[in-house]
Amino acid sequence: MEGADLLTAGVLFLFAAVAAVPLAARLGIGAVLGYLLAGIAIGPWGLGFISDVDEILHFSELGVVFLMFIIGLELNPSRLWQLRRSIFGVGAAQVLLSAAVLAGLLMLADFLWQAAVVGGIGLAMSSTAMALQLMREKGMNRSESGQLGFSVLLFQDLAVIPALALVPLLAGSADEHFDWFKVAMKVLAFAVMLIGGRYLLRPVFRFIAASGVREVFTAATLLLVLSAALFMDALGLSMALGTFIAGVLLAESEYRHELENAIDPFKGLLLGLFFISVGMSLNLGVLYTHLLWVAASVVILVVIKMLTLYLLARLYGIRSSERMQFASVLSQGGEFAFVLFSTASSQRLFQGDQMALLLVTVTLSMMTTPLLMKGIDKWLSRRLNGPEENDEKPWVEDDKPQVIVVGFGRFGQVIARLLMANKMRITVLERDIGAVNLMRKYGYKVYYGDATQVELLRSAGAEAAESIVITCNEPEDTMKLVALCQQHFPHLHILARARGRVEAHELLQAGVTQFSRETFSSALELGRKTLVSLGMHPHQAQRAQLHFRRLDMRMLRGLIPEHSDMVQISRAREARRELEEIFQREMQQERRQLDGWDEFE
């Protein structure tokens, strides 16, 4: 693609995303489906603005690559070892069972048995990009079903390697004298990557971080991700698997959070590009010609995968309320099918329009997943938010709560327990189905669903409540909820959780003055106890704590987020000197007056 054409394509992608995604969000169908529809609109079968879909689709796989790197950063080797049963048990069972059933059906549809095997394996895979994005949107990351879903996706990525190796064997084009030397060299190169990454990555990033230039650190992070992807691609392995391993190798390093922050903006844009590219690849001509065949194929594919996943979730012990979410979020075909079917086509395994039909089926199945998840959410909301079926009265009898607590993680639990202990009428909103079921057993008045939906807030009593306490894990959800409350429920007194100074600045800029940084108060309290243990009088330690809190808050309100680390360091040094002067004056005052305080703990 020429430079001018590439620039034009970039402008079209951005325009399509900016136009389609907000519209999709307003219609309530989700950002992923918005990207897919945008791709259909600008692709060769829509308005025809872009025709070179294959090249763009290959480039857009970088979105999945960046996503897998961030996932790897969140998992250390010990955590992966804990997931071994679900990865190689449930994951393997899902691929084998789904592939066997789907291959049998393809043989009944006049596919050669070799093509049916490849088709069954390709259709058995799910979309890593779509599933992880939807799991994040639906708050499944912390749930048991979300962890199991990730394990299944990870096994599918591992299964890419033998699946691609199987294609030439099925086509009968494999060399009679298997090149063991080439295989051994690939294994050796993979081992070198693991060992080298284990012992070299941290010293390299330590050297780069010492330069103090943020842009160089970001460039080094991009270099690592793209190099790992290119290296694995050269070995004939999954690019996403390579970057996932690189992320795991750095999961226990001190640079984990900085690496994640550097990659996150690129991941979001490239994932959007990936979904747009998938939409562009939808062959509407084949769809029109074989409409009934394709429609039946999509339904059969989704139903078979959902039944398989639901059965495995039940055998694994997942709660009944979470099984439907788990089964539906992995029910689509995946991006790996494009690679596998293209490889099989080059080996002449498919006949006529068979490959085109399979690709259309995969693409449409990906489009059904957001709608299916939305339907599952509505069903769960009616089931979990309806009237109590038993005769026991809930702890909260008043339909008009004083406070709405959004999120019932460790942070939200403490707040809710304190409010309930003081006889406050509260309602809790939570997206984790397991947490909802547990809370209801203990008599909490709780609603399941996404708190960023206006109707759910109304059902929870937002129009009559006095305050809302936002304890979301994701800062994006917090800011979205703040804007929603300010627009639709301006009478609510908003109190929020901030994960750090960046989120605190965002809340202040949005007009929220009542917030708590999740580690700040506990760290201050432990610091006060440390001062007392070193011989400082409890009263003096308490005053030191209050001074520090007051000065830090003043800095927080007055310090605009700076891009320069040196400016931040300079401001911090000034604040430290000011704090030392305050403490010196306090100590002189303490010596002049007798203090009657005693330790009261």
Swiss-Prot record:
Can you say where in the cell this protein is located? Cell inner membrane
Similarity-based family: Belongs to the monovalent cation:proton antiporter 2 (CPA2) transporter (TC 2.A.37) family. KefB subfamily.
Spans traversing the lipid bilayer: 4-24, 29-49, 55-75, 87-107, 111-131, 152-172, 177-197, 207-227, 230-250, 262-282, 284-304, 324-344, 356-376
Q: What's the name of the protein? A: Glutathione-regulated potassium-efflux system protein KefB
PANTHER family referenced in this protein's UniProt entry, alphabetically = K(+) EFFLUX ANTIPORTER 3, CHLOROPLASTIC
Q: Name one GO biological process term.
A: proton transmembrane transport
GO CC annotations? plasma membrane
Q: Which NCBIfam families match?
A: 2a37, PRK03659.1
Subunit structure comment from the entry:
Interacts with the regulatory subunit KefG.
**Keyword check for Manganese:** no
Question: Is Zinc found in the keyword set?
Answer: no
Q: Which UniProt keywords apply?
A: Antiport, Cell inner membrane, Cell membrane, Ion transport, Membrane, Potassium, Potassium transport, Transmembrane, Transmembrane helix, Transport
SUPFAM superfamilies listed in its UniProt record: NAD(P)-binding Rossmann-fold domains
This protein's species is Salmonella paratyphi A (strain AKU_12601)
Task: Report which superkingdom the organism of origin falls in.
Answer: Bacteria
Q: How does it sit in the membrane?
A: Multi-pass membrane protein
InterPro entries hit by this protein: Cation/H_exchanger_TM (IPR006153), K/H_exchanger (IPR004771), K_H_efflux_KefB (IPR020884), K_uptake_TrkA (IPR006036), Na+/solute_symporter_sf (IPR038770), NAD(P)-bd_dom_sf (IPR036291), RCK_N (IPR003148)
Q: What does this protein do?
A: Pore-forming subunit of a potassium efflux system that confers protection against electrophiles. Catalyzes K(+)/H(+) antiport.
Q: Which residues form the RCK N-terminal domain?
A: 400-519
Gene name, Swiss-Prot/TrEMBL: kefB
GO terms, molecular function: glutathione-regulated potassium exporter activity
